[in-house]
Amino acid sequence: MSDKPKRPLSAYMLWLNSARESIKRENPGIKVTEVAKRGGELWRAMKDKSEWEAKAAKAKDDYDRAVKEFEANGGSSAANGGGAKKRAKPAKKVAKKSKKEESDEDDDDESE
């Protein structure tokens, strides 16, 4: 299961990975969250995203090919239960009985 190909990065993420250092250089001491925020602003303002969209499309094609190969070699698919695992729900807590209820039950036991 660990050999399953990872999903490809979006055009934005590909661009952000390449632009991250220059954003940090322009804004020394900037927080990671602020880098992402500034990156989002720059990405929205960018006019020509075709270079990054083409890279993302190629990455998606490579991913689709790798997934087909993975499944052809016996890898599990989502239909076979290979989807995301759900967390186990915590066990429900049993309500504690009040002292009065406990003494009432004790009385019932004694009468039998």
Swiss-Prot record:
Signal peptide (UniProt feature, chain positions): none
PANTHER family: HIGH MOBILITY GROUP PROTEIN D-RELATED, HIGH MOBILITY GROUP PROTEIN DSP1
Upper classification of the organism: Eukaryota, Metazoa, Ecdysozoa, Arthropoda, Hexapoda
Biased segments, Acidic residues type: 103-112
Residues annotated with Phosphotyrosine modification: 12
InterPro entries: HMG_box_dom, HMG_box_dom_sf, HMGB
SMART domains from the UniProt entry: HMG (SM00398)
Location of the DNA-binding region in this protein: 5-71
Name by which UniProt lists this protein: High mobility group protein D
Source species, domain of life: Eukaryota
Biological process according to GO: chromatin organization; regulation of transcription by RNA polymerase II
Main function: Binds preferentially single-stranded DNA and unwinds double-stranded DNA. Prefers sites containing the sequence 5'-ttg-3'. Facilitates DNA bending. Associated with early embryonic chromatin in the absence of histone H1.
Gene Ontology cellular component terms for the protein in this record: chromatin; nucleus
Compartment(s) of residence: Nucleus; Chromosome
Family note: Belongs to the HMGB family.
Gene: HmgD
Origin species: Drosophila melanogaster
Chief location category: nucleus
Molecular function GO terms recorded: DNA binding; DNA binding, bending; minor groove of adenine-thymine-rich DNA binding
Residues modified as Phosphoserine: 10, 103, 111
Keywords from the named record: Chromosome, DNA-binding, Nucleus, Phosphoprotein
Region (Disordered): 72-112
Residue ranges, compositional bias (Basic residues): 84-98
